[in-house]
């Protein structure tokens, strides 16, 4: 538990390496959502994610991040059946030999609840700021989230905060460096994430650099979307780690299954970066 906002979160203690690569395990549409395949049922969701996780672990990713990417259009409050389905998937297929995390689009408390009961090490969420978004006006509450973490006795679950969320734009005027520093200090982020405008869309390297300037060495910064085998070297030259999803999929499509060859190619590039450190 962080008692002092100036105490750096130990990224290497969690992931075991410098410049960790976190791979997305995207859940297909879950029960109750518009694209859910009720004929295939919940078992098909578990089987799909299990196959992807097997490929990602085989490629050597340092951690797996489970996310309900298939639940379009997204909502700001999770459904009971969605939380139950995600908890089932994570409990059944999470790897036992490396860290894993949870991201519930776009409900931080739901992500934390699933993480707490499944043994996850971290969550990724938008927890601060105010936005105009595809889901309407959006104003998450970091204070509520971290108090809920205390209620659950889940302070071992790190909170990675995305400060430039996909499918949204901020209504504020602060620059990225100022925002990153403020979120680090006032909202006690364990890590800061910088995203592009949509899933699979890359942020600028300069945006990641600015977030890092705001955080210094106190809080790690991740490139959160759009990282590819072709650009991961550029991002990891600035960022402390990377989250990747779309580039690992068949034809680079966000909602496609994982392509083992693309996953292996990505990790080959990451290892080359580490060897150059």
Where are these predicted regions, by residue range?
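Catalytic cores of alpha/beta
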Residues: 107-119, 178-179, 211, 217, ...
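Hydrophobic faces of well-ordered beta-strands that scaffold small-molecule active sites
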Residues: 21-25, 64-66, 100-102, 123-125, ...
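Alpha-helix-loop-beta-strand connector modules within alpha/beta enzyme cores
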Residues: 23, 75-102, 140-161, 203-228, ...
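N-terminal amphipathic alpha-helix/helix-capping segment at the start of soluble metabolic enzymes
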Residues: 1-42, 146, 150-151
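Active-site mouth loops of central-metabolism enzymes
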Residues: 26-50, 100-107, 161-177, 222-228
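Conserved anion-binding
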Residues: 27-33, 114-191
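Short loop-to-alpha-helix "cap/lid" segments that border enzyme active sites
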Residues: 173-192, 199-218, 230
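Glycine-rich, proline-tolerant flexible connector loops at the mouths of alpha/beta enzymes
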Residues: 61-85, 130-134, 189-203, 251-253
